[in-house]
């Protein structure tokens, strides 16, 4: 049986549902999600193998105007991910106006000479007339190979999206073993799970100023996994909020994270967390790279 594979970048502004779409395509949670912008910081590969075809979906950070060294890294990650792939999926919301982020991404796609499909997400939230207006507006802006309305939340249209992606697969060996669903190391997945809980449990700027480092990841003879994690924040006042009164907030975050860590690992996990301050780490090239945000 001849095998085929396709590298497919998923890009868009923050909070359009790129990670939700990636998770739905893969069939399991490999990318963290939250209701806050800039949830995704790294490029994450979600791998889907169907019969003789393997799709490698590259979930990217939301495209935005960078204001920190970390932001620069995230924006550069998007730019680099659009180049040299088989297909780019531009994910947008069903809003008639085209924003500056979408305009910027269309220019990046045009410069890459890469085939592109427009994916209009969240169609479960709009009327048909609005959807038709969105399609017309984007059709004038760029010659997309296809325009596909979907709902990553309900799965409506996702199977058709996968079928369209199959047209861009190239003959050759699979890029990953057929039982693999992500290229992320387990330590990175654990760190991202903890960061997701920070995003859900904390307000305003505090979670955006956090980073998570896994300092211990070991498996006992009985299969139980011990994980030590350090949560870094930018201010001493933020540290107090993360820990909470008598440690209540940190306990809540850790408990929620442990449940998802166990789901991913398929075994019991003992998770221990600490909180430390690294002032303005997002504007330090050294610390941004030290926390795993590197090319």
Pin down the residues of each PLM region.
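Active-site glycine-centered loops adjacent to acidic/histidine catalytic or metal-binding residues
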Residues: 59, 121, 151
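Conserved, well-folded catalytic cores of nucleic-acid-processing
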Residues: 28, 47-51, 66, 81, ...
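Catalytic P-loop NTPase motifs of RecA-like helicase/translocase cores
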Residues: 40, 64-65, 97-98, 126-127, ...
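Conserved C-terminal guanine-recognition region of P-loop GTPase G domains, centered on the G4
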Residues: 49, 76-147, 218-221
């Amino acid at each position: 049986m001849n095998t085929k594979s396709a590298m497919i970048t998923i890009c868009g502004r923050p909070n359009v549902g790129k990670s939700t779409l990636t998770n739905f395509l893969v069939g399991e949670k490999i990318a963290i999600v939250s209701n806050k912008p800039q949830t995704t910081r790294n490029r994450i590969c979600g791998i889907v193998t169907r019969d003789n075809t393997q799709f490698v979906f590259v979930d990217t950070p939301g495209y935005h105007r960078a204001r920190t060294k970390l932001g620069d890294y995230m924006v550069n990650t998007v730019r680099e991910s659009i180049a040299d792939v088989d297909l780019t999926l531009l994910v947008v919301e069903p809003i008639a106006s085209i924003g500056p982020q979408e305009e910027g991404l269309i220019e990046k796609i045009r410069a890459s000479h890469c085939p592109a499909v427009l994916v209009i997400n969240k169609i479960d939230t709009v009327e048909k007339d609005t959807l038709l207006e969105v399609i017309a507006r984007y059709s004038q802006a760029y010659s997309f190979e296809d325009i596909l309305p979907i709902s990553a939340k309900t799965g409506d249209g996702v199977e058709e999206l996968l079928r369209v992606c199959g047209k861009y697969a190239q003959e050759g060996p699979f890029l990953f073993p057929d039982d693999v669903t992500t290229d992320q190391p387990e330590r990175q997945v654990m760190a991202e799970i903890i960061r997701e809980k920070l995003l859900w449990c904390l307000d305003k700027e505090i979670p955006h100023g956090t980073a998570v480092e896994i300092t211990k990841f070991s498996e006992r003879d009985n299969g139980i996994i011990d994980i030590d994690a350090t949560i870094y924040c930018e201010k001493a006042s933020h540290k107090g909020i993360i820990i909470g009164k008598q440690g209540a907030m940190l306990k809540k975050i850790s408990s929620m994270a442990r449940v998802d860590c166990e789901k991913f690992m398929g075994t019991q996990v003992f998770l221990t967390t600490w909180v430390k301050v690294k002032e303005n780490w997002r504007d330090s090239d050294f610390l941004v790279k030290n926390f795993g945000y590197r090319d």
